Swiss-Prot record:
HAMAP family: RuBisCO_L_type1. It catalyses: 2 (2R)-3-phosphoglycerate + 2 H(+) = D-ribulose 1,5-bisphosphate + CO2 + H2O; D-ribulose 1,5-bisphosphate + O2 = 2-phosphoglycolate + (2R)-3-phosphoglycerate + 2 H(+). The record marks 335 as: Transition state stabilizer. Disulfide bonds: none annotated. Its cofactor is Mg(2+). Heterohexadecamer of 8 large chains and 8 small chains. This is Ribulose bisphosphate carboxylase large chain. Substrate binds at residues 125, 175, 179, 296, 328, 380. The gene is cbbL. It comes from the Bacteria. The modification N6-carboxylysine is found at residue 203.
């Protein structure tokens, strides 16, 4: 027995019966993670009376090689190598009864290039473990050797901007509203008006697929006609995210191929199709020179609560590995969940070549992306022209700002809504480039631009009092310096 950790060694471990996880080698406080280890950070909330170290060791065991009792077949494997090792447990600041558990996994435990296999190990079974009241996967670190087994984003931010010939500003988009019920012809009219008015993209919503009121093929035809007409009228490259999400991969490939035949530069999928389907469509997009947009439909069912589930920063990392080009990552100021610092962390994951540890953004590890392309984050949900200075300041320029209701809900019409957003953006970019303090002068800059733009003036008046000031449920908890081990 190891006197320091209480770990049972050698033949003693293989007595029949049940043994504590921390005595089976899943708790190794002296272990130093290797550069080639995958590291996961869990927020562990044990049941009353359960030792936090035992609970954390159980997470390590149940997400790697352990089961509920000693098994003799462990002696047929390199058990010391393949056991996940919980090497650090810290109390979560300000949250009594919860602990951050750092767990290292040998790289050989994972199939190269497979998010499905990775997630099956890390979150596949352990979240239902009875000794745990709650469990959340907060962050992960992937070694370069593992990152290089994935293709990464099919197109990337740089190539996307080159294809669109649009630089130095955020891209503008809008989700077609109402999301359900429009005929194909009327849907196409919305797309045309929005693009002609100055937007770069329009977008299908997550649940518009192929329903009785509008077959997918009709939608594709009318939308691409609208894109072509808007391009001819504006002289700019335009696009619309055609949602190819369907019930089978065969149907999705059929829709993607038809979108390509029509000349679309981008297709869209939903997160709910699953990790394998996402990777399959990312490979198709790369082979066919298409931009791949991912709507994070369904994510809040497991990302929103702080105590249980999977943090969206982990989903963002998985999706960058998987190969999507766009991902919805929050707005901070809109109607959807988004703590400012936490959201900045998501954007860091999307857009940086190397993520340094940044605890205030919820990033617990250094992460190299090994030359994988960058993802374009998308801000969507409850934003409008009057927030343009805040959006530019908080989110930067490599982002798609999607004003759905803020375009289609404009009192003067869809084209006027698009004009208002484009003029507001151009005014703010000009002010930034001139070196002005556009963050504090934002309302003044917008008011001046509105003097010569009636649609913007109307937008500022209609939505001047619209705010979504609610307390975020997912704020970063972090340990500024290493605390004493529990």
């Amino acid at each position: 027995m190891n006197a320091h950790t209480g770990t049972v060694r050698g033949k003693e471990r293989y007595r029949s019966g049940v043994m504590e996880y921390k005595r089976m080698g899943y708790w190794e406080p002296d272990y130093t993670p290797k550069d080639t280890d995958v590291i996961a950070l869990f927020r562990v909330t044990p049941q009353e009376g359960v030792d936090p170290i035992e609970a954390s060791a159980a997470v390590a065991g149940e997400s790697s090689t352990a089961t509920w009792t000693v098994v003799w077949t462990d002696r047929l494997t390199a058990a010391e190598k393949y056991r996940a090792k919980c090497h650090r447990v810290d109390p979560v600041p300000g949250t009594p009864g919860s602990y951050f558990a750092y767990i290292a996994y040998d790289l050989d435990l994972f199939e190269p290039g497979s998010i499905a296999n990775l997630s099956a190990s890390i979150i596949g079974n352990v979240f239902g473990f009875k000794p745990l009241k709650a469990l959340r996967l907060e962050d992960m670190r992937f070694p370069v050797a593992y990152v290089k087994t994935f293709q990464g984003p099919a197109t990337g931010i740089v190539v996307e901007r080159e294809r669109l010939d649009k630089f130095g500003r955020p891209l503008l988009g809008a989700t077609v509203k109402p999301k359900l019920g429009l005929s194909g012809r009327n849907y196409g009219r919305v797309v045309y008006e929005a693009l002609k008015g100055g937007l770069d993209f329009t977008k299908d919503d997550e649940n518009i697929n192929s329903q009785p009121f509008m077959h997918w093929r009709d939608r594709f035809l009318y939308c691409i006609e609208a894109v072509n007409r808007a391009q001819a009228a504006s002289g700019e490259v335009k696009g619309t995210y055609l949602n190819i999400t369907a019930g089978t991969m065969e149907d999705m490939y059929e829709r993607a191929e038809f979108a390509k035949e029509l000349g679309s530069c981008i297709v869209m999928i939903d997160l709910v199709i699953g990790y394998t389907a996402i990777q399959s469509m990312a490979k198709w997009a790369r082979r066919n020179d298409m931009i791949l947009h991912l709507h994070r439909a369904g994510h809040s069912t497991y990302t929103r609560q702080k105590s249980h589930g999977v943090s969206f920063r982990v989903i963002a990392k998985w999706m960058r590995l998987a190969g999507v080009d766009h991902i919805h990552a929050g707005t901070v100021v809109g109607k959807l969940e988004g703590d400012p610092n936490t959201t900045r962390g998501y954007y860091d994951v999307c857009r940086e070549d190397f993520n340094p540890t940044k605890l205030e953004h919820g990033l617990f590890f250094d992460q190299s992306w090994a030359s994988l392309n960058k993802m374009m984050p998308v801000a969507s949900g409850g934003i409008h022209a009057g927030q343009m200075h805040q959006l530019l300041d908080l989110l930067g320029e490599d982002v798609v700002l999607q004003f759905g209701g803020g375009t289609i809900g404009h009192p003067m019409g869809i084209a006027a809504g698009a004009i208002a957003n484009r003029v507001a953006l151009e005014a703010m970019i000009l002010a930034r480039n001139e070196g002005r303090d556009y963050v504090h002068e934002g309302p003044e800059i917008l008011a001046k631009a509105a003097q010569t733009c009636t649609p913007l003036k109307s937008a500022l008046e209609v939505w001047k009092d619209v705010t979504f000031n609610y307390q975020s449920t997912d704020t970063p908890d972090f340990v500024p310096t290493a605390l004493e081990t529990v």
